[in-house]
Amino acid sequence: MGAYLAPPGKTARTVANALLGVPIANLVMVPLITWVGQSLNYRYAFGIIALCGALACAAMFIWLPPMDDIAPSNPRQELGLFKNRQVLLTLFAGLFGFGGFYGFLTYVTRTVETITKMSPSVMPIIMMLIGIGGLVGTFLAGHLSDRLPEGAFPIVMGCFVAILAFSPLMVKTPVTLFIEVFLVGVFGAGAFSASMQVRLIKHAGDAQNLASSMNHVSLCLANIIGSFVSAQAVQHHLGGDYMYIIPAVLGAAVGAVGLVFLLVAVYFVKSGKDQPAEQEQSVGEH
C-alpha cells in the first residue's frame, strides 16, 4: 500500500514512512501502556490498546483513497515469487543477517551488569535508545533506498555486522555502551527491516503482498536461530567473562554469511543477469 501511494521517485521513502508506526510505538506507546498497566490496572492498558486499534481502523477507512485500479492478486502468480532469485537471495540475507539483533538484545541486561558494571535500573534508558535508534534508522533506510536502490540494504547490513562485531569493545564503558545500543537500534531495529522490505518490493513484481509477508517470516526465523545460538553460547560459557556479549559477535559472523548472499544478489543485478521488477511508472498515477 505504501508503494502504491508513493509519488514518483519516492517509493522507498514512502514505504519506510509507512513503517514508522513500529518504532514510534516502541518509543512512546509501549512505555506508556506499561506505565498504565503498572500504575493503574492492566484492564485499562488493554482498553487503551483496543481503543487505539479502533481509531486506527476508522482513520484508514476515512482517509485512505480508493484503490480500485489495483488488480486482484492471483495466488498462483504470487507463489511464483519463490522462483525469483533476487527475492530468495534477499530473504536468505535477512535470515542470516538479522539474528544478531536478538542475540544482542536478549542478554543486554546481563551485559550491563557484568561487563559495563552498571545497575539494571538503566534498562529503560537502554530501551529508549534502541527505540530512538529504530526511528532514525527507518528514516535513514527510506532516504538511502531512494538514492541507492541496490546499495542501501548492503550498506545497512554491512554496518550492522560491523557494529555487532565490535560490541565487546563498545560495552566496556557507559558512554560507549550507550553509543553501541543506539547504533544497534539504528541499523538493527530500524534500517534493516525497512531497507529489506524496500528491496523485496522492488524485485517482487506482481507478488508484492507475499514478498512483504515473507520479509517478516525471514526475520522471525532469524529470531529463532539467533535466540537458539545465543542460548547455546551462554550455556557453554563461551567467551568467559564476556559470554553475554558473545551472542552478538556470533550474530556478526552469521550476518557476514547473509551479507555474502546479498552481495551475490547485487552482482546479478549489476551484471544484467537479473532486472528489478519496478512498478515506478504505475505508482502515483491514481
Regions found by a protein language model. Give the residues of each.
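Cytoplasmic helix-loop-helix junction between adjacent transmembrane helices
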Residues: M1-L20
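A late C-terminal transmembrane helix in Major Facilitator Superfamily
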Residues: K202-G240
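A membrane-interface helix-boundary motif in multi-pass transporters
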Residues: Q38-A50, A231-A256
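Helix-to-loop junctions at the C-terminal end of transmembrane segments
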Residues: G137-P149, V234-Q235
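Intracellular juxtamembrane helix-capping segments at the cytosolic ends
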Residues: M1-A6, G190-A204
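C-terminal membrane-cytosol helix-exit motif in multi-pass small-molecule transporters
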Residues: A50-I70, F261-A265
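C-terminal transmembrane helical hairpin of 12-TM major facilitator-type secondary transporters
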Residues: G151-M196
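Extracytoplasmic gate region of multi-pass secondary transporters
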Residues: V87-M128
